[in-house]
Regions:
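Conserved P-loop NTPase mechanochemical-coupling segment
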Residues: 1-18
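Conserved coupling segment at the C-terminus of the helicase ATP-binding
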Residues: 6-10, 23-41, 45-167
């Protein structure tokens, strides 16, 4: 009801996440098909906005997390295990190609992105089909991590930098 009433309001008071966070922003105002009207924002805690913006619009994946989940799902889903291994191999290749940290071109992670998409689809199917799985929470947590990564990946433009860290 609050969202519907907002269409008739001259002012909306809300947390800044509803304006800036890519997962919870008010899509009816700021998403595709939203109004073209100009907005004025009065932002509380604005001194934290730059750092929070970096957090909201950044995503990272760790190779070790793929391996850890692979061990967890080993007994429960062979297809998911294989997809986790494929992602791990792509990340291992990136890791081996860098000493310390290096900027990565978008094309260099294309194959990884495809496998992440397949993995996310498999996880979604598993989660829908296995409400009572003993590994559900671990899969769900990793699924949200992948989902956030995919959301940020879809927003990539010249303002983003992708980097890989070895070690």
């Amino acid at each position: 009801l609050g969202l519907d009433m907002s269409l008739f309001s001259d002012g909306i008071i809300c947390d800044y996440n509803y304006v800036f966070d890519p997962h919870v922003y008010l899509k009816r105002f700021f998403g595709e098909g939203g109004t073209a009207d100009p907005y004025i924002f009065l932002i509380d805690e604005a001194h934290n906005l730059v750092e929070r913006g970096r957090e909201m619009y950044s995503a990272s994946l760790l190779k070790e997390d793929f391996l850890a989940l692979k061990k967890v799902v080993h007994e429960y889903d062979a297809k998911m295990e294989r997809l986790l291994e494929k992602c791990n191999r792509h990340m291992l290749q990136l890791k081996r190609e860098c000493e310390g940290c290096r900027i990565v071109q978008l094309e260099e992670i294309d194959a990884l992105i495809v496998e992440i998409g397949r993995l996310a689809e498999r996880m979604e199917t598993y989660l829908e089909d296995h409400d009572d799985s003993p590994v559900r929470n671990e899969i769900l947590e990793f699924y949200f991590l992948l989902s956030h990564f995919q959301t940020i990946y879809d927003k990539l433009d010249d303002n983003y930098v992708i980097f890989a860290a070895g070690g």
